[in-house]
Amino acid sequence: MASKRKSTTPCMVRTSQVVEQDVPEEVDRAKEKGIGTPQPDVAKDSWAAELENSSKENEVIEVKSMGESQSKKLQGGYECKYCPYSTQNLNEFTEHVDMQHPNVILNPLYVCAECNFTTKKYDSLSDHNSKFHPGEANFKLKLIKRNNQTVLEQSIETTNHVVSITTSGPGTGDSDSGISVSKTPIMKPGKPKADAKKVPKKPEEITPENHVEGTARLVTDTAEILSRLGGVELLQDTLGHVMPSVQLPPNINLVPKVPVPLNTTKYNSALDTNATMINSFNKFPYPTQAELSWLTAASKHPEEHIRIWFATQRLKHGISWSPEEVEEARKKMFNGTIQSVPPTITVLPAQLAPTKVTQPILQTALPCQILGQTSLVLTQVTSGSTTVSCSPITLAVAGVTNHGQKRPLVTPQAAPEPKRPHIAQVPEPPPKVANPPLTPASDRKKTKEQIAHLKASFLQSQFPDDAEVYRLIEVTGLARSEIKKWFSDHRYRCQRGIVHITSESLAKDQLAIAASRHGRTYHAYPDFAPQKFKEKTQGQVKILEDSFLKSSFPTQAELDRLRVETKLSRREIDSWFSERRKLRDSMEQAVLDSMGSGKKGQDVGAPNGALSRLDQLSGAQLTSSLPSPSPAIAKSQEQVHLLRSTFARTQWPTPQEYDQLAAKTGLVRTEIVRWFKENRCLLKTGTVKWMEQYQHQPMADDHGYDAVARKATKPMAESPKNGGDVVPQYYKDPKKLCEEDLEKLVTRVKVGSEPAKDCLPAKPSEATSDRSEGSSRDGQGSDENEESSVVDYVEVTVGEEDAISDRSDSWSQAAAEGVSELAESDSDCVPAEAGQA
């Protein structure tokens, strides 16, 4: 209770509005000598003298309250818990407590009026009751204030179990203005268990029984009995516990009575220090059967003990709900209506109905505070507007009974409290905007995009493995349990014939999603939390989008430029690009998922209708998620070769392959995506003639030459007999010029390397090759025009500088020849497909 110094500090337990009576100082302390047993009556004077001697010999009765270890005496110093006052004189300290803190019970004593039994420990009183009053539960406790001593007198009543706080003095007698308590069916009356093993008693703690007369009978430690109203036994531990104290509200006569059985045979005090039990009670005071079973296994205690423990804790905290109210509170709690603020938990008791005045409910009669665990407070709340406050060590929250919910957050209110000027009132925080209640994960409605991802995965496998589940978690943002439940439900529906998920229905869904996106205001981040980008203006987003089209990984110079133009920090720009890349990859992956990973290699032989549907799907998705690219950029022969090589291997590259192609070719990613889309359309009509050649040469290197091509060209170069016709025939047949064949041509025509090259057709202008490449954007058969330039470049191993220029000349000549040969045959192959792009 108090700070540890070289003396024990008197137990200070708060009471409320207890009137101090001018009783003669005939009683001060009770001397502890042994275990109390009933003894014959002694005179009142001898008893008073004994108490006075006790107060001199043993200045302070040591108190153990709710897990607080025994205090040691340190040089006779005393320190007040509730204010900075400290002194080395016990009398001055007690006077200070009585005058400055009138609501504190100091060194209470217990007495049994039936047997004249006196003790200072509640354990001794419990042992006495179990021995001499077995099976008796109708006890009446009367609190008497006598100078510096508080007396709790126990008597047996035949009707109700009443705990009342009274005052004794001239003219008052035994007035019963207290907390009346009736019997409860929750806990069976019985004998309390005194666990001597867990709470060993020291010799100085052993108390003798003393005999008193009239109402001046002393009982034990009020802090203990009030903190253990249900017979709870205290342990010497360091965990925080709830320590209620008696406090009379102004409307004490209107407050209903709460049953607090003092004797029970099944209460297990060891559960008071069990962290699992405490956490479970803090979450919800009414455990379900499943929770009880789990707690039984976790705590290694019988289920009946756990039930009794929960019932006692509810009595302590004034929680008494009907089954309907429990169900309602549980639903609201798990539906997310409780917005938890970490240091405070407010427990509101049941609403008082006019017809149920006799319902046993505790209403602020026993306000509680947590000792040793300041981050968690359970506070009683009255049915009226009474404000409950506590010391600065703990945080108490008060409020008004809410008709709609039983455990909401209640805004603390500051109210004057004349009896406790030293207590810090809880300030009222500014009002917060009410958020709509969150729905549980199982009840959240999935978006069309999430369902499309789930259906695409469902088509591949109705029993997804862990890798697929994790991928769906990243793509859809759903929880693992939601994904598992969705798959389970749809497996059941498919087996019963309720739903039929096919590729056609998936394609329709994707088209509908794309159309809805295209129809509404452009928002490039549908799958991400809006708060990440809500602070960016449209102008900032446009600047970022333009930069993203150029490169998804901006350079340092580009980042500096964006920081200047958008006024955003580097972290914000990096985060935006990261989310934008993630969105782009997810959209591309969605196209792959919609057609199934096992179908990627079968697109060539697929029906035209299926390919058309997939192309429409991919086109709609990509055009809706990606802004319109810049005008077509002419590609070099090397870039075209790399694209064709990848296209021959897979017509649907993964996002990683797109990144690799962008790095190798230097092209913008959107251009690469568009090129693949157009060539898939051309492949559908069967007009991509270079496809077969690339498929037959899987081992070709990145430079476009392989052994097969070289062997095919050599015989053609050697066949002509007339040396003057060698070069034109060589070019006419293979339409290629290999560097290693150049020497053979030179020897046959008996000319140098330069004349041999002059025999080839003239080099076309650069604009011709640009036009032939740009024609692919207008649907004029670009891929067939590019067929003649399959060989992009050859790796030069000779030392002549002119060999490189020879190679470039041959490429341009081949491209010009290909334009003239294929312009007519392929002019009608793509108008419709190019128009879709």
Curated annotation (Swiss-Prot):
Family label: Belongs to the ZHX family.
InterPro entries, per the entry: HD, Homeodomain-like_sf, ZHX_Znf_C2H2, Znf_C2H2_sf, Znf_C2H2_type
Location of the region described as Required for nuclear localization in the Swiss-Prot/TrEMBL record: 317-446
UniProt subcellular location: Nucleus
MF term (GO), any: protein homodimerization activity
GO cellular component terms, A-Z: chromatin; cytosol; nucleoplasm; nucleus
DNA-binding region: 263-324, 439-501, 530-591, 628-690
Ranges of compositional bias, category Low complexity: 164-180
Signal sequence segment: none
Pfam families documented for this protein: Homeodomain (PF00046), zf_C2H2_ZHX (PF18387)
Region: Disordered, residue numbers: 164-204, 404-445, 755-837
Chain positions found as Phosphoserine: 825, 827
GO biological process: central nervous system neuron differentiation; mRNA catabolic process; negative regulation of DNA-templated transcription; negative regulation of neuron differentiation; negative regulation of transcription by RNA polymerase II; regulation of transcription by RNA polymerase II; retinal bipolar neuron differentiation; somatic stem cell population maintenance
Organism of provenance: Homo sapiens
Positions of region (Required for homodimerization): 195-358
Residue ranges covered by zinc fingers (C2H2-type): 78-101, 110-133
UniProt biased composition (Basic and acidic residues): 192-204
Region listing for Required for repressor activity, in residue ranges: 263-446
SUPFAM superfamilies (UniProt xref): beta-beta-alpha zinc fingers, Homeodomain-like
Protein name listed in UniProt: Zinc fingers and homeoboxes protein 2
Phosphothreonine found at: 37, 207
CDD domains: homeodomain (cd00086)
Extent of Pro residues compositional bias: 427-439
Keywords: Differentiation, DNA-binding, Homeobox, Isopeptide bond, Metal-binding, Neurogenesis, Nucleus, Phosphoprotein, Repeat, Repressor, Transcription, Transcription regulation, Ubl conjugation, Zinc, Zinc-finger
